């Protein structure tokens, strides 16, 4: 990436007012894009059409078109693990699967999809029941990372489409307190468990799975024990999504209840695969297919649209502009929809785990920064938390506002106020308020000149904060599919420009390795290579972990 070119382009932008860009009368129209389900207004970004054209040239120079083609065609773009990146193929028609995967693998994928659809159908119709013959009332999905965040964000986003007779819960954290609280609400005789782990060795997932298994077996009745039904509890009520079939079988899961995973589907992009089983159980096969259809439509847009009108490409270039040219280190994700409350957390993982790197694909140290720090919260809650800092600190925090124009609640006035707040915040972040404006307002009050001089500086707001506003008509499976695919592609494009491998996550591994060592030390093993700080903390834990809490 030509970082010098970016820096020279940004020279004027750093002292320019975004408001002044609206002297161009057609700016709102010219700096907006539409797809079949989404509308993007990026006119409040601090960028001109000339600068955007220069960014597009940079994208062309690094071979973005070829990279897009390579990803969709199955090139092994995850070079550190020697893998293709083909989550997109899972939402494509079967004929495309056959073209890219070949008949054998395409048929294997289709068989897995049909197996999953049958499970969903049989559970929802009461054909597949618990070991006591009862219909399932709850699904407990156990996973972590991509097998958690994707399911969680989709479940909340599509909560209005959920089967009311079947409650789906997701557990990820290894904290036993979270699991204990969840199990208190469940009936073991009517709970279906789905364990999601590619290797079936993930520490957090397997600890939680073993704890749930122990809970279920401890709940077994005397009659179950007399009839030797205990193995049936796991055999009939548990499913696994894994590539390690033998480990799942050894755990006690029926071979017919094991759905496959593939190494060319990364965890944080896996909701479109069999990992989506808990979601499909919640919303049904038809809606799950609509989710994939919405994503596929975004795929087609991404592959076939010129860069200037390509929504993922434009969002990616704007992110590059803000991160590397204007040097803003953060990105706020502010969905003005309670159903999208899990989106900021999902994008934290998808964005920062993908592009939070400092070496190129070839292993060279990069001379530019990569992924921003992503944070956010649902609106309007965020307005009463971190928005104070966004308005009045010296930090500029680029923001993505996301809103649905139509609500599903009977409280239509509430939704109108919600949308108004979304639009108002994007305007306020851009406009700000000068000292002169504040003083003029205060002069209309009964305050003295001295009081105005004291108060006025505290009411000024810097403004000039860039933002996107992403709009959809209504939260539907299709729009959510398009939204998730949009961010997937945006992150991929940024990875291409930053020249990083967006599909590995070696930074996660060091903590795992040290976690194993520290666990051994807690259990009594000596490890002189650990720091004095860690050894002291371990000693404190060993001395006090069995102390009865005073409260």
Curated annotation (Swiss-Prot):
SUPFAM superfamilies linked: SIS domain
Biochemical pathway: Carbohydrate biosynthesis; gluconeogenesis; Carbohydrate degradation; glycolysis; D-glyceraldehyde 3-phosphate and glycerone phosphate from D-glucose: step 2/4
Name of a matching Pfam family: PGI
InterPro entries: G6P_Isomerase, G6P_Isomerase_C, Phosphoglucose_isomerase_CS, SIS_dom_sf, SIS_PGI_1, SIS_PGI_2
Documented EC number(s): 5.3.1.9
The entry's keywords: Cytoplasm, Gluconeogenesis, Glycolysis, Isomerase
Any Gene Ontology biological process: gluconeogenesis
GO MF: carbohydrate derivative binding; glucose-6-phosphate isomerase activity; monosaccharide binding
GO cellular component, one term: cytosol
Subcellular location: Cytoplasm
Predominant localisation class: cytoplasm
Active-site residue numbers: 353, 384, 512
Catalytically driven reaction(s): alpha-D-glucose 6-phosphate = beta-D-fructose 6-phosphate
Family that this chain belongs to: Belongs to the GPI family.
Purpose: Catalyzes the reversible isomerization of glucose-6-phosphate to fructose-6-phosphate.
Name of the protein in its database record: Glucose-6-phosphate isomerase 2
Taxonomic lineage: Bacteria, Pseudomonadati, Pseudomonadota, Gammaproteobacteria, Alteromonadales
Gene expressing this chain: pgi2
């Amino acid at each position: 990436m030509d970082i010098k070119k970016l820096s020279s382009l940004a020279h004027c932008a750093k002292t320019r007012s975004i408001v002044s860009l609206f002297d161009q009368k057609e700016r709102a129209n010219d700096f907006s894009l539409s797809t079949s389900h989404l509308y993007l207004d990026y006119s409040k970004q601090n960028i001109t059409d000339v600068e955007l054209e220069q960014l597009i040239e940079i994208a062309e120079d690094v071979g973005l078109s070829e990279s897009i083609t390579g990803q969709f065609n199955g090139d092994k773009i995850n070079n550190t693990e020697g893998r293709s990146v083909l989550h997109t193929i899972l939402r494509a028609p079967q004929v495309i699967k056959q073209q890219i995967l070949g008949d054998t693998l395409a048929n294997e994928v289709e068989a897995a999809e049909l197996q999953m659809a049958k499970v969903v159908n049989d559970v929802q119709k009461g054909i597949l029941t618990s070991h006591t013959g009862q219909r399932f009332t709850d699904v407990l999905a156990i996973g972590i990372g991509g097998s958690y965040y994707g399911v969680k964000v989709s479940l909340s986003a599509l909560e209005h489409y959920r089967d009311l007779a079947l409650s789906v819960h997701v557990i990820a954290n290894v904290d036993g307190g979270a699991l204990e609280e969840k199990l208190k609400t469940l009936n073991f005789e009517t709970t279906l468990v789905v364990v999601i782990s590619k290797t079936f060795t993930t520490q957090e997932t397997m600890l939680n799975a073993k704890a749930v298994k122990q809970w279920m077996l401890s709940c077994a009745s005397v009659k179950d024990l007399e009839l030797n039904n205990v193995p049936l509890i796991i055999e009939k009520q548990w499913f696994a999504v894994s590539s390690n079939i033998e480990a799942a079988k050894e755990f006690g899961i029926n071979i017919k209840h094991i759905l496959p995973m593939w190494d060319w589907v990364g965890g944080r992009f896996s909701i479109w695969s069999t990992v989506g089983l808990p979601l499909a159980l919640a919303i049904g096969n038809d809606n799950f297919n609509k989710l994939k259809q919405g994503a596929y439509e975004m795929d087609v847009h991404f592959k076939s649209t010129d860069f200037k009108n390509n929504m993922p490409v434009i969002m990616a270039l704007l992110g590059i502009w803000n991160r590397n040219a204007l040097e803003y280190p953060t990105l706020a994700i502010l969905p003005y929809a309670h159903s999208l409350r899990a989106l900021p957390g999902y994008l934290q993982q998808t964005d920062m785990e993908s592009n939070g790197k400092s070496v190129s694909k070839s292993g060279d140290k990069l001379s530019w920064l990569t992924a921003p720090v992503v944070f956010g919260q649902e609106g309007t809650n965020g307005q009463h938390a971190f928005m104070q800092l966004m308005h009045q600190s010296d930090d500029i925090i680029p923001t993505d506002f996301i809103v649905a124009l139509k609500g599903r609640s009977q409280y239509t006035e509430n939704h109108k106020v919600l949308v108004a707040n979304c639009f108002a915040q994007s305007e306020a972040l851009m406009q700000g308020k000068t000292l002169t404006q504040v003083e003029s307002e205060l002069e209309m009050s009964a305050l003295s000149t001295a009081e105005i001089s004291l108060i006025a500086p505290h009411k000024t707001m810097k403004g000039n904060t860039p933002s996107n506003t992403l709009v959809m008509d209504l939260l539907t499976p299709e729009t959510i599919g398009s939204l998730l695919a949009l961010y997937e592609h945006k992150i991929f494009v940024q990875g291409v420009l930053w020249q990083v491998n967006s599909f590995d996550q070696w930074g996660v591994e060091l903590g795992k390795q040290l976690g194993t060592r520290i666990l051994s030390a807690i259990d009594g093993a000596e490890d002189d290579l650990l720091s004095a700080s860690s050894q002291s903390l371990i000693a404190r834990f060993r001395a006090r972990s069995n102390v009865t809490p005073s409260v």
